[in-house]
Amino acid sequence: MQYSEIMIRYGELSTKGKNRMRFINKLRNNISDVLSIYPQVKVTADRDRAHAYLNGADYTAVAESLKQVFGIQNFSPVYKVEKSVEVLKSAVQEIMRDIYKEGMTFKISSKRSDHNFELDSRELNQTLGGAVFEAIPNVQVQMKSPDINLQVEIREEAAYLSYETIRGAGGLPVGTSGKGMLMLSGGIDSPVAGYLALKRGVDIEAVHFASPPYTSPGALKKAQDLTRKLTKFGGNIQFIEVPFTEIQEEIKAKAPEAYLMTLTRRFMMRITDRIREVRNGLVIINGESLGQVASQTLESMKAINAVTNTPIIRPVVTMDKLEIIDIAQEIDTFDISIQPFEDCCTIFAPDRPKTNPKIKNAEQYEARMDVEGLVERAVAGIMITEITPQAEKDEVDDLIDNLL
């Protein structure tokens, strides 16, 4: 027998009261986006559960994708059969023969939304249990915590059988907590920060700063690939490429070396905040971890934060590097993050960055530059690409292929 659909149960949505259907509709759309790589799969949702109809798609692959989607508590693969007692008896016998191993216990759990069906739930449990005994005479029934709980549901259109429950990712559906702008470099930390924001329902847009010719097409592609890895948790993500060469050259020419990193981060924060305002975001998210590098001190964060009143979320701020790496490996971003392409934060990095920069000094050095003009030109030059779970070969891929 082949699975016909996957029955999906919701996570924290049960606590959302009058907003429940808004959360459910968002989750349905997210599931549809993530499963868009399987065109034949169709997704529906109601107040109690969602259904992914396989229509011939490979169950194992679809299930692996579903495991990542935030907002799902658990799900079960389901067999759809004709709504008749004889067909049901034959189906439970076939299923039990496939999965039963010596010494296992079982029970039948039936329920029906079609109350015109010829047997009630108790009678159906007894009838189907008897069919199992016919197929496997020595099998034992156990009502509490059996090895196999074969669930049977009688609906108006058909009967459905399942025996397996698979844990989902939990969390909230992406997009139900508002939008945030993720400052995405090419490193290990920022994709993990994005992942943790997604888990709490934040719809992220990835802001990446590129400084050609100092940063390569490979660095840009790396950031896009990291973004694509994050789409599996809630669907498509807008990737915003910011031209940053002019600003970095200006900082390099007009500021002392010790303040290069501080000023660079202040400009990045200004630009990200301007993009957030235009695109109706609520927060800025980054991958800073306290004390991990010389520029990520509380004094440095204070100096960088000073250019905006927008809330800054730093999901990994209290984590050790090894904790962050563990998550990066779990979400499959680590191997991409360690590819040897330099990003904006490393190309002009000073040997001894200021660990306790003063806001007054930063403002004094910025007074030598046309800050507003630099920010406006950078924002005017952004390029936005929608990143989907399905990778498409693009010009950067072709360029890298030629270089290799």
UniProtKB/Swiss-Prot annotation:
It is found in: Cytoplasm. Coiled coil: none annotated. SMART domains: THUMP. PROSITE patterns: THUMP (PS51165). Residues 60-165 form the THUMP domain. Pathway: Cofactor biosynthesis; thiamine diphosphate biosynthesis. It catalyses: [ThiI sulfur-carrier protein]-S-sulfanyl-L-cysteine + a uridine in tRNA + 2 reduced [2Fe-2S]-[ferredoxin] + ATP + H(+) = [ThiI sulfur-carrier protein]-L-cysteine + a 4-thiouridine in tRNA + 2 oxidized [2Fe-2S]-[ferredoxin] + AMP + diphosphate; [ThiS sulfur-carrier protein]-C-terminal Gly-Gly-AMP + S-sulfanyl-L-cysteinyl-[cysteine desulfurase] + AH2 = [ThiS sulfur-carrier protein]-C-terminal-Gly-aminoethanethioate + L-cysteinyl-[cysteine desulfurase] + A + AMP + 2 H(+). One of its GO terms (biological process) is tRNA 4-thiouridine biosynthesis. Gene3D superfamilies: 3.30.2130.30, HUPs (3.40.50.620). Catalyzes the ATP-dependent transfer of a sulfur to tRNA to produce 4-thiouridine in position 8 of tRNAs, which functions as a near-UV photosensor. Also catalyzes the transfer of sulfur to the sulfur carrier protein ThiS, forming ThiS-thiocarboxylate. This is a step in the synthesis of thiazole, in the thiamine biosynthesis pathway. The sulfur is donated as persulfide by IscS. This is Probable tRNA sulfurtransferase. It comes from Streptococcus pneumoniae (strain 70585). The gene is thiI.
